[in-house]
């Protein structure tokens, strides 16, 4: 019974949506729901349209990093990583952080600095890592996907589709390390600032009962590390002005 319930959840979270402000799956938007075991598309609209996916990119960034590094590898944060544009986990140039911590910062807080640091460590450079991402996408059969960076910041050629993005998550969740990280709601970082990170994915927080556990003064989560157990157990959110809001 538990296995059936988990499989049902698996299918639900394999929904990827790009919603404009005024409608559902119109114009530059699309969605897809896949069978969690076979990858067969169950329902969708504009599911093969090539669109910007924002930080859903980080699903693939995380998987490629996990497959090509050790979680306990130590990464010295470069100035380039620390100064990355967009969302951040506030890494400081020169500090040393494990790959594992960077992965949690990537998936829970969508840190672009974490994405850059992982890319430099695993690929030797951001460009080298992006090459690995695209090679892995070809192996996975993601025919509508091209990556230009590891964070999902807007680039005209950085595109995927709802079907491909759902497939990214389906494939990534077959990796136990990824599943553990992507389903974590709270994580205490071993960075210089030592913050307690809460997953930005609202469905995960609400499912675990953690949505309201925030200190009003510090705006920081007050509970210990916890994994999602509700209607969604893993996923990723994203946003750019061009892509709009994205969800997996």
Segments the model singles out, each with a brief description of its role:
Residues 23-163, 167-176:
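Active-site-adjacent loops and short helices of periplasmic peptidoglycan-processing enzymes
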Residues 3, 21-22:
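Protein maturation boundaries and topogenic segments
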Residues 8-19:
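Bacterial N-terminal signal peptides
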């Amino acid at each position: 019974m538990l296995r059936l319930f988990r499989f049902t959840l698996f299918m639900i979270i394999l929904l990827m949506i790009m919603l404009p402000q005024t409608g559902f799956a119109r114009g530059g938007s699309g969605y897809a729901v896949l069978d969690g075991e076979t990858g067969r598309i169950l329902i969708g609209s504009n599911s093969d349209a090539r669109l910007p996916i924002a930080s859903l990119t980080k699903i693939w960034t995380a998987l490629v990093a996990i497959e090509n590094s050790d979680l306990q590898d130590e990464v010295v944060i470069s100035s380039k990583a620390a100064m990355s544009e967009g969302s951040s986990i506030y890494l400081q140039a020169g500090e040393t952080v494990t790959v594992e911590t960077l992965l949690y910062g990537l998936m829970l807080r969508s840190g672009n600095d974490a994405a850059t640091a992982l890319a430099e460590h695993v690929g030797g450079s951001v460009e080298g890592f992006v090459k690995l991402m695209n090679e892995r996408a070809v192996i996975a059969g993601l025919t509508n996907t091209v990556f230009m960076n590891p964070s999902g910041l807007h680039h005209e050629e950085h595109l995927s589709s709802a079907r491909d993005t759902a497939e990214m998550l389906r494939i990534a969740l077959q990796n136990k390390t990824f599943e553990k990280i992507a389903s974590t709601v709270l994580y205490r970082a071993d960075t210089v600032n030592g913050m307690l990170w809460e997953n930005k994915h609202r469905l995960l927080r609400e499912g675990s009962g953690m949505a309201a556990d925030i200190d009003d003064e510090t705006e920081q989560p007050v509970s210990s590390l916890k994994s999602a157990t509700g209607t969604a157990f893993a996923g990723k959110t994203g946003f750019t002005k061009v892509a709009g809001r994205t969800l997996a």
